[in-house]
C-alpha cells in the first residue's frame, strides 16, 4: 500500500532544471498528494524560500523535509505547520552547525532519522556508502545533543514515522 508521495521538491544546487519547471512539478505533486490524502517526502536543496512558499499553498498536505539542510528558523516554521524534519548522517559531521542547532531545538515529536542512502554516511563512516545499519549513529548523535539515550530517540522517531505514514504499531 502506498504510504507517501516522494521524493518531491526543489533542488537549486546544480541549476540543470529551470526553477520554474521545478516549482510547477512540485505544485503538481503536492496537488496529487492532496487529492490522494497522502503525506509527502520533500527534497529541498538551496530553495528554502520557494519550498516554504509552495508548501504554504497546500496547508492540508503534510510530510517530512528529508535530509534537512535549512535554518532553525525555517525548521520552526515547518514544525508550526505540522511538518517533520528528517536528519541523516550530516548531523554527525564536525562542520554541521545548522543541522546540530535544528536537532537540538525542534520538538522531539517532529524528528525523523534516515539514511539518504547511499549518501550522507555518518561519522566515522563519512565518505563511504551509507546503509540502514548506520542509522543508530544518527540516533546516538541526536540523543547526545538532547541529553537522551539512543533508545529514547529510536522509540520517538519510530512513533513519529508511524504517525506520519499512518502505520499501525507492530506492522
Set out the residue ranges of the language-model regions.
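Conserved beta/loop motifs at nucleotide-recognition and modification sites
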Residues: 116
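Divalent metal-binding pocket/active-site signature
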Residues: 1-81, 93, 101-102, 106, ...
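His/Asp/Glu-enriched short active-site or ligand-binding loop at hydrolase and phosphoryl-transfer sites
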Residues: 82-96
Amino acid at each position: 500500500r502506498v504510504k507517501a508521495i516522494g521524493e518531491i521538491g526543489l533542488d537549486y544546487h546544480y541549476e540543470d532544471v529551470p526553477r520554474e519547471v521545478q516549482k510547477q512539478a512540485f505544485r503538481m505533486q503536492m496537488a496529487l498528494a492532496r487529492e490522494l490524502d497522502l503525506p509527502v517526502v520533500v527534497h529541498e536543496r538551496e530553495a528554502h524560500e520557494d519550498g516554504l512558499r509552495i508548501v504554504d499553498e497546500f496547508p492540508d498536505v503534510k510530510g517530512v523535509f528529508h535530509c534537512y539542510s535549512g535554518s532553525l528558523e525555517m525548521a520552526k516554521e515547518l514544525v508550526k505547520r505540522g511538518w517533520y524534519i528528517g536528519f541523516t548522517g550530516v548531523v554527525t559531521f564536525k562542520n554541521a552547525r545548522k543541522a546540530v542547532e535544528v536537532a537540538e531545538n525542534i520538538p522531539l515529536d517532529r524528528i525523523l532519522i534516515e539514511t539518504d542512502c547511499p549518501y550522507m554516511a555518518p561519522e566515522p563512516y563519512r565518505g563511504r556508502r551509507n546503509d540502514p545499519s548506520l542509522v543508530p549513529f544518527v540516533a546516538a548523535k541526536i540523543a547526545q545533543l538532547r541529553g537522551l539515550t539512543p533508545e529514547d530517540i529510536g522509540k520517538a522517531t519510530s512513533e513519529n514515522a508511524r504517525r506520519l505514514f499512518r502505520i499501525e504499531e507492530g506492522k
